[in-house]
């Protein structure tokens, strides 16, 4: 990789004006342009993107069909608020999303500007429909940065520090972890243990008949790409139905083909959510989100209970329609499944040679590669993970960490196999270099990652 002179100067200048609360620190990358799975920075350096803008660019950067849809719509109508009137792209998109949502029940849609407000919407609609106040969410979850979604989240102290009190009546329970288990535990044992933890609040202080919904990520994204066991998910789903509690899912990070299924919930058998949030890749990174819910639930609120001036913007809606077409007609769900299986095998092979790789979790092109100090104790190794991503960056690969010690592997779904192989080789080399003590982190970098 070449020098970062221009990038470093620009960042030094930006730091005078840009609040540190709005960016997690990794390394000095100032992106100038991008296409497919390739990034080019302001100094002319090229990188293979293994992050896809936090899983917001599933169809790849500047996909021709998405760019054309944006340009064509911008020539006709950039914006008129859907809060009062109508436009065709929004009409078409609401119908499309209602029809492709998981399950056979009639669905309705409400648009927003980010996954954060889509999760706020889940709080609103769940409380309105049930007439109940309590919401159950999960430790390790990330649902956004509006006040409601930030309260729902459980992944960072900085999301509650100095800004409380948070939204009342939100209860967090542990998310099942099939990697760190007790000796001799089977997946069945793990499911039952965590389901018992799930039930404890209901047995002590949380009235089930006053609980509006349970919100869960079928696969936790920022928590480390962790999938709940099938049996656990079915037990929670059944519990919700037995107690009149809505079952809601967050598909913002994991939806739209990321997991090798259109929706992450389709990794499980016969589960139909009452409410779901989508965003990020919905419009290829353009500011658009949606809450999709069963018709009767979505009819529980009247305007202006959940509307935004720019939500469902015509340009964003056109971008989303084009994005959904690309996912369908280019077979990206199937490609994600195939390439993800290939990448998983490559990482498992690396694990045999690199004991720092404690766990390889992969569903589609969607992986959490957990680095540990010892495969027996499973003690997290954040130092090694930081060195791996710095080595990767220096050798033309963009990847970041989750929870300090987990590599976040989420490339654009369009990544060619050749680029995927190149990136995987760089990571393999990075593990070797770190093991040999050949990687150091600059002293002035500050705190890295979450």
UniProtKB/Swiss-Prot annotation:
Catalyzed reactions: L-isoleucine = D-allo-isoleucine
Q: Which key words tag this protein in UniProt?
A: Isomerase, Pyridoxal phosphate
Q: Where are the transmembrane segments?
A: none
Keyword rRNA processing tagged: no
> Which Cys residues form disulphide pairs?
none
User: How does its activity depend on thermal conditions?
Assistant: Optimum temperature is 50 degrees Celsius for the forward reaction, and 45 degrees Celsius for the reverse reaction.
Per the UniProt record, one Pfam family is Aminotran_3
Q: How does activity depend on pH?
A: Optimum pH is 5.0 for the forward reaction, and 6.0 for the reverse reaction.
The record's listing under InterPro entries reads: Aminotrans_3, Aminotrans_3_PPA_site, Class-III_PLP-dep_AT, PyrdxlP-dep_Trfase, PyrdxlP-dep_Trfase_major, PyrdxlP-dep_Trfase_small
- Specify which residues bind pyridoxal 5'-phosphate according to the UniProt entry for this protein: 115-116, 142, 250-253, 309
| Subunit-level organization | Homotetramer.
Q: Which family does this protein fall into?
A: Belongs to the class-III pyridoxal-phosphate-dependent aminotransferase family.
The name of this protein is Isoleucine 2-epimerase
Which organism was this protein described from? Lentilactobacillus buchneri (Lactobacillus buchneri)
């Amino acid at each position: 990789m070449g020098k970062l002179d221009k990038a470093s100067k620009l960042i030094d200048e930006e730091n005078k004006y840009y609040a540190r609360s709005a960016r997690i620190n990794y390394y000095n990358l100032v992106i100038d342009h991008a296409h497919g799975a390739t990034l080019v920075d302001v100094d002319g350096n090229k990188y293979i993107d293994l992050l896809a803008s936090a899983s917001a660019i599933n169809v790849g950067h500047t996909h021709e069909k998405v760019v054309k849809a944006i340009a064509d719509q911008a020539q006709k109508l950039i914006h008129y608020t859907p809060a009062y009137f109508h436009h065709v792209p929004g009409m078409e998109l609401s119908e499309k999303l209602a029809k492709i949502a998981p399950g056979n029940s009639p669905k309705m849609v409400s648009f927003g500007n980010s996954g954060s407000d889509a999760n706020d919407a889940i709080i609103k609609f769940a409380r309105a429909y049930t007439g109940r106040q309590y919401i159950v969410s999960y430790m390790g979850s990330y649902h956004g940065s509006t006040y409601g979604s930030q309260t729902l989240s459980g992944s960072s102290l900085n999301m509650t520090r100095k800004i409380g009190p948070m939204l009342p009546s939100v209860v967090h329970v542990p998310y099942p972890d099939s990697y760190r288990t007790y000796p001799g535990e089977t997946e069945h044992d793990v499911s039952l243990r965590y389901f018992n933890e799930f039930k404890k609040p209901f047995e002590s202080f949380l009235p089930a008949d006053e609980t509006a919904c349970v919100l869960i990520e079928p696969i936790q994204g920022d928590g480390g790409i962790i999938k709940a066991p099938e049996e656990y998910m079915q037990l929670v789903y059944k519990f919700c139905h037995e107690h009149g509690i809505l079952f809601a899912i967050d598909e913002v990070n994991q939806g739209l083909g990321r997991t090798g299924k259109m929706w992450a919930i389709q990794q499980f058998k016969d589960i139909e959510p009452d409410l779901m949030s989508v965003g990020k890749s919905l419009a290829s990174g353009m500011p658009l989100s949606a809450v999709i819910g069963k018709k009767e639930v979505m009819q529980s609120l009247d305007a202006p209970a959940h509307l935004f001036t720019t939500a469902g913007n015509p340009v964003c809606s056109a971008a989303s329609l084009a994005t959904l077409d690309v996912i369908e007609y280019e077979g990206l769900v199937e490609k994600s499944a195939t390439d993800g299986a290939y990448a998983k095998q490559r990482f498992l092979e690396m694990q045999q040679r690199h004991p720092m790789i404690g766990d390889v979790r992969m569903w589609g092109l969607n992986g959490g590669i957990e680095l540990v100090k010892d495969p027996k104790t499973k003690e997290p190794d954040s130092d090694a993970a930081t060195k791996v991503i710095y080595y990767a960056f220096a050798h033309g690969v963009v990847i970041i960490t989750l929870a300090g010690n987990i590599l976040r592997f989420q490339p654009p779904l369009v990544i060619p196999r050749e680029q995927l192989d190149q990136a995987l080789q760089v990571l393999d080399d990075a593990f070797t270099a770190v093991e040999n003590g050949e990687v150091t982190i600059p002293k002035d970098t500050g705190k890295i990652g979450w």
